[in-house]
Structures are given as structure tokens and as C-alpha cells.
A protein has these predicted regions:
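Sequence/structural signature of beta-propeller modules
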Residues: 4-9, 13-86, 335-344
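A short beta-strand motif characteristic of beta-propeller blades
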Residues: 79-90, 130-136, 188-195, 239-249, ...
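Beta-strand-rich domains and repeat architectures in extracellular enzymes and scaffolds
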Residues: 84-117
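Repeated scaffold domains used in trafficking and secretory/extracellular systems
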Residues: 93-98, 140-147, 194-206, 250-257, ...
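Short coil/turn segments that connect the beta-strands within blades of beta-propeller domains
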Residues: 103-104, 151-153, 208-210, 262-264, ...
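Blade-loop segments of beta-propeller domains
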Residues: 129-152
Length: 344
């Protein structure tokens, strides 16, 4: 190949790289502009979002919101349609619920609001925002909370229980090697554990080596409890199938999630199209109700799980889901806030 042709090909390659970079930067800027407009009604949140800008990773879009996503059917009707049209089933009603963060990945959980498909986990690369894979979960749990335990490299998630809370876990290695979407065979949990002291596990968090799980209640308040983090030994011996709470606390209504800093307990309170709130409590508060909150911060509606990560607050919303999108103000990405700015 002549030198002129080599230089021409090299020039085309460089131009191509520039175009890809420009398109990515333009798309990022467009998302930022849209989100900035959404946050105008929430000055504290907007200020914290802008403060996180220099540290912000790629746009962390939630899969399956603006278009249908591949899914595995659970109902006879949906399965029949899959066979009839001879293609992988598609779900337009996946609704995001849980969020967890590891060094390299974001984990998002979602359930089908039409109750036709298995619940799912999405694994997203933190640095690029790329959706790496979808993991199919057994049955149709709400999966309202996730926790990633970095010490054991295990993901914990809430699942449907019978009269008490229930959580399950899967190792990171198993998740990364999973092919459940291709095979239509849901992933198998490594362990399922019942949480005594609460009627169901609506949300999940971790603090100081403990799992923290609580119940969502619409009218009469709920309960949140701390549990010793189950130890899963390398020998294959499973943890106790049921654990008792170390302590329990009464909560306000409409609690979607909790998270912890060294000083504070943060409580996400949200239900329906009205603005959500983040309530700030002393970490040792024994009652988590309005009069005990140190501060209440107005947030966009449909706030779900919040996660504290290295001075930032990761926030997941379900407003971009098909069931709520028409109500306006949808947020399609994980919003990252500077925590010090938010709490100042």
C-alpha cells in the first residue's frame, strides 16, 4: 500500500474518532441540559447536581425506559406471543426500583408493572455508562432494594417473602458470567434468607457491617430493622436461613429507601406524582418521623433508592417508566449529587 493511501486511511480513522467523540459529548450535553431544566423546581438538588459535575461519570441511563427491552415472559399470553412472532419477548413496562454501586459497576433492578415478565437486573459500567448485560431474576419480585457487599463481592436484593422480610444474594462473578436472558432460564440465587421482625422487605441498605431493611407503609408508618450481615463461607456452608434484628425503629409513611453517612441517616420519602423528599436524621435517631427529622429537602417525584458513595449521593427514579412517564417530569438516568453541598 502506498504512503498516500496509508495517510488517507489514517486521516479517515482520526476523523471518525473525532466524530464519535463529538457525538458522545453532544449527547452528554443534551442530557445535562434536559436534567438541569427538570431540576429548576428543586434548587437544593440542582445545586448539589451542579457541584458534582466535575466528578460526574458518564450519563448513567436506565435501560428499558424509552423503548422496550428484551425480557422473559411469565404469563401464558406473553409466552404465546413470543412463540407466534418468533422473536425474543419485549417488555415496555419495566419499572426501576433498586440501586447498588460497586467499584466498577452500577446494578439496577426492575419489575414488570404489567406482571407479564420476570424481574430483571441491569449491570452498567460506571466509567462509560454502557449497559453491559441484563440478568433475569426468578419470578416477579418488586426488588425494591439492592446492596453490594464489597468485602465478599456479593449483591444482596429484596425478594417476596411470606409474613416476614426476605433477601437473596448472588456473587458478582456469577452475575458477570450469567446468560439467563439468552437461555430464558432465570439466574439461581446463592442464598435466600428470611428477616424476622418486619412483615416484608420493601427496601435495603447497608451500614457498619449490617443489612438494614424496612417496610413501605402508606398510612400507618413502617418499621426499619438492622441485621448482622450474613456470612457466606467459602466452604459452601450457607448462612442461617432466618436472622433476627439487632434493633428496630419506627418510620414515617411512604419510605422508599434509606442510606447512611458517618453522621446521618438519609430517608427517601415518595409516593405518586407529588414531589418527593429526602429527610435527614441523626444516625442514632430512634424514631424516624417528621418531628425528629433535622432537615427535609424537596426532590423530584418518584424517587426510589438512594446510595451514598464516596461523598456523592446516587439517586434512582421510576418516573421514566412506562406506567408514570405520561405524568410529566420523567428522569431517565441515575442522578449523582454532591452530598456535602446537598446537606450544607
Amino acid at each position: 500500500m502506498r504512503q498516500t493511501e496509508i495517510l488517507l486511511l489514517l486521516g479517515v480513522f482520526v476523523v471518525g474518532l473525532f466524530v464519535v467523540y463529538w457525538l458522545k459529548k453532544h449527547r452528554h450535553a443534551r442530557h445535562n441540559q434536559a436534567l438541569a431544566a427538570q431540576l429548576k423546581r428543586y434548587p437544593s438538588v440542582r445545586k448539589a447536581w451542579l457541584a458534582a459535575g466535575a466528578k460526574r461519570e458518564a450519563v448513567l441511563l436506565v435501560p428499558g425506559l424509552k423503548k422496550a427491552t428484551a425480557a422473559v415472559a411469565t404469563t401464558a399470553t406473553a409466552k404465546a406471543e413470543t412463540r407466534l412472532y418468533k422473536h425474543a419477548d419485549q417488555c415496555q413496562a419495566m419499572t426501576p426500583q433498586g440501586l447498588a454501586v460497586s467499584e466498577d459497576y452500577l446494578f439496577l433492578s426492575a419489575y414488570c408493572s404489567q406482571q407479564e415478565h420476570h424481574s430483571q437486573l441491569y449491570i452498567i459500567e460506571r466509567t462509560s455508562g454502557r449497559h453491559l448485560k441484563t440478568v433475569v431474576l426468578p419470578k416477579r419480585p418488586h426488588v425494591g432494594g439492592l446492596v453490594f457487599d464489597r468485602a465478599t463481592q456479593v449483591l444482596w436484593l429484596t425478594i417476596t417473602g411470606k409474613g416476614m422480610g426476605r433477601v437473596a444474594c448472588v456473587s458478582l462473578q456469577t452475575l458477570l458470567e450469567d446468560d439467563s436472558l439468552a437461555t430464558s432460564q432465570p439466574i439461581a440465587y446463592q442464598q435466600v434468607i428470611e428477616l424476622a421482625g418486619i412483615t416484608h422487605s420493601s427496601y435495603l441498605a447497608a451500614d457498619s457491617g449490617e443489612l438494614v431493611s424496612g417496610t413501605f407503609a402508606l398510612k400507618n408508618g413502617g418499621v426499619v430493622a438492622n441485621y448482622p450481615l450474613p456470612v457466606l463461607s467459602d466452604s459452601g456452608r450457607k448462612a442461617s436461613p432466618r436472622i433476627k434484628p439487632r434493633k428496630r425503629r419506627v418510620t414515617t409513611t411512604k419510605v422508599q429507601s434509606v442510606a447512611f453517612t458517618t453522621e446521618y441517616l438519609l430517608l427517601a420519602r415518595s409516593f405518586g406524582p407529588r414531589s418527593a423528599e429526602l429527610w435527614v436524621f441523626s444516625k442514632d435517631a430512634t424514631v424516624l418521623t417528621r418531628k425528629h427529622a433535622l432537615r427535609r429537602i424537596k426532590f423530584p417525584h418518584y424517587l426510589e433508592q438512594i446510595v451514598v458513595e464516596k461523598g456523592q449521593l446516587y439517586c434512582l427514579f421510576e418516573s421514566g417508566a412506562w406506567a408514570y412517564r405520561q405524568k410529566g417530569g420523567s428522569i431517565d438516568e441515575v442522578v449523582v449529587l454532591d452530598l456535602a453541598t446537598l446537606l450544607q
